[in-house]
């Protein structure tokens, strides 16, 4: 009887330990929710692949929250990481948004700080085992900043790779839009539809028609291909582009699924990528002695 009881206790203990082991227990994809020990296991499970969802704080018409880009990009990134495991960095909103400084609630960090903070962040992520970092962009104002940042990684040797994944919307099977896609650029039909899925509690659809999101085209005299920083303000001074009132949950579900699937595919591709770091290292070595590079 005693031996039988002891055996049962031993089996129970082993079962508990096995159930709590990293391989069997559910590891959160949220960096900030992991314990120090679990974080180590999470990095191993993620194959050193981490996501940095990148948002911003800016006006989104009269009907969406200031952090809409951050909320949406984190929604899709977290859902993707749960399908293809990756560690997701906490809220990050230190990007380019000078064009919205005239609107309340906008937080626009200086250009030097934006790049310095992003570099420090990816360096620290890498020091903690994230050797493959996918910056998931959720803000159109970062479309030039982030590729430049990725390119600048060639300035100094690093033991990790930065990848940049852009905003992914639209595609085959997309529901028909009610508004003009050409001006559906900010807090309009598409973005508002996605927000109805990510954070429906923060969408005030009834307020959308109270402000114009029309293109004012105040620089139409300039030729195509000629760039000036005031272009966005010249077209959309209300910092609203499109028709948010046209949003639907049907379109939002399509947008969310498309973006999540795109991130999942990117995570899988990055996990399998062995060439980028090898080529980086080759480039760093050759850069030390450019005169020795075969011509």
Outline where the language-model segments fall:
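Bacterial N-terminal signal peptides
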Residues: 4-17
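Extended, histidine- and acidic-residue-enriched regions that form the cofactor-binding/catalytic faces
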Residues: 20-112, 116-132, 140-295
């Amino acid at each position: 009887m005693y031996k039988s009881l002891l055996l049962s206790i031993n089996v129970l203990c082993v079962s508990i330990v096995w159930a709590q082991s990293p391989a069997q227990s559910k590891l959160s994809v949220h960096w900030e929710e992991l314990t120090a020990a679990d974080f180590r296991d999470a990095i191993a499970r993620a194959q050193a692949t981490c996501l940095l969802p990148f948002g911003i704080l800016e006006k989104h018409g009269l009907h969406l929250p200031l952090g809409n880009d951050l909320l949406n990009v984190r929604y899709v990134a977290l859902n993707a990481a749960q399908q293809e495991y990756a560690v997701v960095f906490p809220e990050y909103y230190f990007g380019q948004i000078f064009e919205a400084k005239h609107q309340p609630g906008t937080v626009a960090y200086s250009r030097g700080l934006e790049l310095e903070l992003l570099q420090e962040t990816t360096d620290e992520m890498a020091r903690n085992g994230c050797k493959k970092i996918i910056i998931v962009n959720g803000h159109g104002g970062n479309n030039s900043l982030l590729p430049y940042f990725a390119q600048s990684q060639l300035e100094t040797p690093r033991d990790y790779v930065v990848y940049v994944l852009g905003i992914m919307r639209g595609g085959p099977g997309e529901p028909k839009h009610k508004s003009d896609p050409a001006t559906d650029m900010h807090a309009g039909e598409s973005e508002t539809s996605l927000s109805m899925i990510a954070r429906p509690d923060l969408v005030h659809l009834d307020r959308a028609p109270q402000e114009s999101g029309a293109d004012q085209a105040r620089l139409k005299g300039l030729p195509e291909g000629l760039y000036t920083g005031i272009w966005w303000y010249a077209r959309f001074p209300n910092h609203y582009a499109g028709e948010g009132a046209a949003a639907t949950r049907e379109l939002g579900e399509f947008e969310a699924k498309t973006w999540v699937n795109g991130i999942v595919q990117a995570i899988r591709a990055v996990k399998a990528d062995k060439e980028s770091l090898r080529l980086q290292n080759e480039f760093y070595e050759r850069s030390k002695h450019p005169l020795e590079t075969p011509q």
